[in-house]
Amino acid sequence: MSGSIDTLALKEEDVTKFLACASHLGANNVDFQMEQYVYKRRPDGTSIINVRKTWEKVLLAARAIAAIENPADICVISARPYGQRAVLKFAHYTGATPIAGRFTPGTFTNQIQTAFREPRLLVVTDPYTDHQPVTEASYVNIPVIALTNTDSPLKYVDIAIPCNNKSIHSVGLMWWMLAREVLRLRGTISREVPWEVMVDLFFYRDPEEAEKEAQAEQAAAEKDKAPKEEFTADQAFTAPGTEVSDWASEVPVAPVPILAGGVDAATTEDWSVPAQSDWTAPAANPANAAAAGAPAPAPAAATTTESWGGSGAENWG
């Protein structure tokens, strides 16, 4: 299909993406209508899908999607959790109407219910899991595009894109490539420049891991928004010093001089009173002496005692 046009030819980088996401690996069982897309079979029974035919079907499906004038008339569905994020991203970039999760029976056929829709084109992730919308689409003549594995039933499927629709990365890659080709056909993006949207955005993410990452980002944002203490001129600043364990060894202590007058000279309040050296004599009262107008009596000189109560006889007998 795209062999004669170099612009639509399969690029080496796209083949690398197919192989990295294991989009070429099918199931062990092969439906009789999917045999034309099987390239070979491995010794363990796994079928190998021809990626060139996968690419051609991606281009065909993109042309069918781009032919719809109103993008909201395109309904993309995924009941499997692995394809719900990819469906929402595809609808975000192309303007389609997503139905992620459980499909309410009667959405396409029951005109009484609130969620009634009349789409012009239906794109599903797995025709086996999404059998209810595929069956209802056959009742109201809605064409169906589906990502099909080697064991997927092709009943009521108009355009089958052979790929591994059981792998997380393969499902995200196929929706990413389909969205990129639709935007290229519409002229929104150029074929000369790579699409700035990463394929990782279409991959399924565990809700618990996503919640942990959101909490970590919120904590980091709150930490950055916290007011920081600003230093002002009135604020005192103390430089950090070394810790001293023994303060007595660091502080010099001056020696205390011993006064010649004894304790009384150091503790008396009247410094005109001379120091008292004879502790047997009564202390003079400076207050009475000052009242009488007489000078204070001089302290008596200490007498030396020569006799200690014994005789000087030399006879000890």
Swiss-Prot record:
Cell compartment(s), UniProt: Cytoplasm
Swiss-Prot/TrEMBL keywords: Cytoplasm, Ribonucleoprotein, Ribosomal protein
Main location: cytoplasm
Keyword Ribonucleoprotein: yes
Gene Ontology cellular-component terms listed: cytosolic small ribosomal subunit
GO molecular function: structural constituent of ribosome
Residues covered by region (Disordered): 277-317
Coiled-coil portions: none
UniProt keyword ATP-binding present: no
One GO BP: ribosomal small subunit assembly
Biased composition (Low complexity): 281-302
Stored PANTHER family: 40S RIBOSOMAL PROTEIN SA (PTHR11489)
Role of this protein: Required for the assembly and/or stability of the 40S ribosomal subunit. Required for the processing of the 20S rRNA-precursor to mature 18S rRNA in a late step of the maturation of 40S ribosomal subunits.
Family, as annotated: Belongs to the universal ribosomal protein uS2 family.
Subunit structure: Component of the small ribosomal subunit. Mature ribosomes consist of a small (40S) and a large (60S) subunit. The 40S subunit contains about 33 different proteins and 1 molecule of RNA (18S). The 60S subunit contains about 49 different proteins and 3 molecules of RNA (28S, 5.8S and 5S). Interacts with ribosomal protein S21.
Protein name per Swiss-Prot or TrEMBL: Small ribosomal subunit protein uS2
